[in-house]
């Protein structure tokens, strides 16, 4: 009841630097509150869990939002830079940076988790996609990354952690 605005972590840092409250599309799409077709906060979902949709600021696309730093930030840093939104979600940035010019490329981003996906112009909302564990996240240029989370390096990381506890080093 006391909150007036909800910001994702990258957007919160942007707010601290500029005083502007916006919600960058790719990171906003990961929270489960964004209507994948309309690309804005889904008031039906939010109302069911007791959150007001007006708490979420306007969605901005990566690269479409540029605002100067706050005067005190400029003075402290000596910078005349502006903040420009980028794909804040790491997967969206990784997919954007992948060296492929093919429209039908499949991407695999690996770390603790691995995420496999394709770029699409529209969300895939079929029962079949849901049954197979695919989800739609925001991508660069207002596109959709149709993704599936798959096992990454977590098993290897946990195995190494356990072996280290046992005094073994590999």
Regions found by a protein language model. Name each.
Residues 26-28, 53, 141:
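Short glycine-enriched loop/turn motifs at secondary-structure junctions
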Residues 10, 14-35, 58-61, 66:
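Short beta-strand-loop/turn "lid" adjacent to the catalytic site in phosphate-handling enzymes
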Residues 43, 49-63:
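A conserved helix-loop-beta module that forms one wall/lid of the active-site cleft
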């Amino acid at each position: 009841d006391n909150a007036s605005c909800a910001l994702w972590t990258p957007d919160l840092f942007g707010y601290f630097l500029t005083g502007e409250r916006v919600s960058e599309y790719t990171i906003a799409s990961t929270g489960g509150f964004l209507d994948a077709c309309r690309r804005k906060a889904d008031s039906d979902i939010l109302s069911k869990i007791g959150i007001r949709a007006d708490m979420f600021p306007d969605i901005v696309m990566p690269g479409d939002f540029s605002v100067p730093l706050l005067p005190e930030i400029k003075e402290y840093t000596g910078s005349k830079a502006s903040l420009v939104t980028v794909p804040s979600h790491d997967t969206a940035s990784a997919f954007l940076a992948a060296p492929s010019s093919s429209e039908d490329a499949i991407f695999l981003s690996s770390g603790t988790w691995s995420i496999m996906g394709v770029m699409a112009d529209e969300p895939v909302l079929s029962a079949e996609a849901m049954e197979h564990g695919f989800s739609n996240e925001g991508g660069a240029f207002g596109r959709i990354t149709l993704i599936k989370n798959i096992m990454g390096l977590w098993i290897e990381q946990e195995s190494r952690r356990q072996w280290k506890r046992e005094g073994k080093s590999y």
